[in-house]
Design a protein with these regions (language model features):
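Non-catalytic, solvent-exposed segments at the cell envelope interface
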Residues: 1-289
Length: 289
């Protein structure tokens, strides 16, 4: 993935901004895997989750971008055709940008609608996600309330438990079991990623490529990063993710002001203030939904 192909980019601010994407890529999965992981068998791939992780001098901030967010698709250069497509003021769900022209258009759309420059892009598919969780021996979670969801395969009791790859995927994909649907799901995704980072982001793992590479290697079949992102950058991202739940760290959903055409409409004033604080690497005082 080449960020230099993204046009009309915002100026860089202080700190580092990662766009972290979970896709529904089924690449390398057998029919048995798809059935076991409750992924379905849709062709192509779409974004199942999107987050911005800001790492700066005032602690990391993790912001979930609901896939049903109402956004404007701006002008862009086709990732394969090289042709420039003009912006026509067309509004759609955020995850449609990825479906239309992949990571480059998703980054372009996020930057256009937020004004925040993305420094690094990280994407992982279903099988890779489950593989990484299994590679570290599972992730311990404290689930406050029992829930079930046939679509994702989730069936959890309340309390502390260690989730394997299959269970972890079901946990982060569940939306229909919650009243808030996508907004509740993004909160669970944040909790899980923080727990995953707490177990993987230790100096013994991050600073030792012989330990870090096998851990990430379990997901390499479906791992996509921008061409300038190395192992050190991935390690820094894991450390920042770990810090989200401690000290000055903060996790939130993008501030929402209501709905439009069935999509979630961002609160423009709050988003503008949030982006300004991130650009200046100031403590985030804005709250999300």
């Amino acid at each position: 993935m080449d960020l230099s192909k993204v046009i009309d980019r915002p100026e860089a601010g202080d700190g580092t901004n990662y766009l972290i994407v979970g896709s529904d890529s089924r690449e390398g999965m057998s029919d048995e895997d798809k059935k076991k992981l409750h992924t379905g068998s849709a062709e192509g791939k779409r974004t199942d989750s999107m987050m911005i992780l800001h790492d700066g001098s005032n602690g990391p901030t993790l912001i979930s971008l609901p896939r049903d967010s109402d956004v404007e698709i701006p002008s862009f250069v086709g990732s394969k055709s090289g042709k420039k497509y003009p912006g026509r003021g067309r509004h759609t769900k955020l995850n449609a940008a990825y479906a239309e022209d992949g990571p480059e258009l998703l980054v372009r759309t996020v930057e256009h609608n937020t004004g925040l420059r993305i420094d690094h892009y990280v994407e992982i598919g279903f099988a890779g996600f489950a593989g990484i969780v299994d590679a570290i021996g599972g992730v311990e979670m404290d689930i406050p309330k029992a829930f079930k969801d046939k679509k994702s395969g989730a069936d959890f009791q309340a309390g502390k438990q260690t989730l394997n790859g299959e269970q972890a995927l079901a946990f982060v994909r569940t939306r229909y079991a919650f009243a808030g649907s996508d907004l509740d799901r993004t909160k669970n995704q944040q909790k899980f990623l923080a727990a995953l980072a707490n177990q993987t982001a230790t100096p013994a793992t991050i600073l030792n490529p012989f330990k870090l590479y096998p851990t990430l290697g379990a997901g390499l079949d479906t791992l996509v990063v921008d061409k300038d992102m190395g192992l050190f950058d991935l390690g820094s991202m894991f450390f920042a993710m770990k810090g989200v739940t401690g000290g000055d760290g903060k996790s939130m959903n993008m501030p929402i002001a209501g709905t439009v055409g069935g999509n979630l409409r961002w609160d423009k004033a709050k988003v503008a203030k949030l982006v300004d604080q991130l650009k200046k690497d100031e403590p985030v005082t804005v709250s999300g939904n």
